[in-house]
Design a protein with these regions (language model features):
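Helix-rich, typically C-terminal accessory recognition domains appended to large enzymatic cores
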Residues: 21-175
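Primarily short, surface-exposed interaction patches in extracytoplasmic proteins
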Residues: 2-3
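C-terminal, charged and often intrinsically disordered regions of DNA end-processing helicases
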Residues: 12-20
Length: 175
């Protein structure tokens, strides 16, 4: 990671960024997500405070959706129509691509896929018509399982709020 000026971080240049104030202000999970999303594992890049603010917005969107999902109660609607098929397609595509991205150390791409999956979950949530709540909760749970390696504390907290008894890290990776 380069300094904000684009030069290699160095005490002598005075462009070293300490993570401590960022952890204090945003939390370790937001900082971790920023580092994974903002920089290619192989290439790096310059530090940018706007990037961490963007990750904070993503984090907030996950939090808002999690509160909605937690408050939902199962319904008898178990239909799989076009909206459900779209959501399942996005879920399966995300799992497949993220698995490959993680194996290739393309963490920035894997994180971008999480953002796309969150967009699909929000789209399903705000669409007109009756929802398949069971499917929606399952897809959101899979999202949390995928998020867990990138934001472990946040994911564990949501996982427990979803009513799961064992740790998110003792749960099976989505297939």
């Amino acid at each position: 990671i380069l300094g904000p000026d684009g030069a290699r971080m160095s005490k002598s240049r005075g462009n070293v960024i300490s993570p401590d104030p960022y952890v204090e202000k945003y939390g370790s999970d937001v900082l971790r997500l920023y580092l994974l999303f903002g920089f290619s594992y192989r290439e790096g890049g310059p530090w940018d405070d706007n990037g961490i603010k963007a990750i904070t917005k993503f984090y907030d969107r996950v939090e808002r959706l999690s509160q909605k999902v937690i408050s939902l109660h199962a319904n008898k609607n178990d239909k799989i129509d076009a909206a459900e098929k779209d959501l399942l397609y996005t879920r399966n595509y995300t799992v497949r691509c993220m698995t490959r991205d993680i194996e290739d150390f393309s963490f920035n791409t894997a994180t971008a896929r999480l953002m796309e999956y969150l967009n699909a979950l929000n789209k399903y949530d705000t669409a007109d018509g009756e929802k398949n709540i069971k499917l929606f909760k399952e897809c959101f749970s899979d999202f949390i399982l995928l998020l867990a390696p990138f934001a472990p504390h946040f994911s564990e907290e949501i996982w427990e709020q979803l009513g799961n008894k064992k740790s998110v890290f003792l749960s099976s990776y989505p297939e």
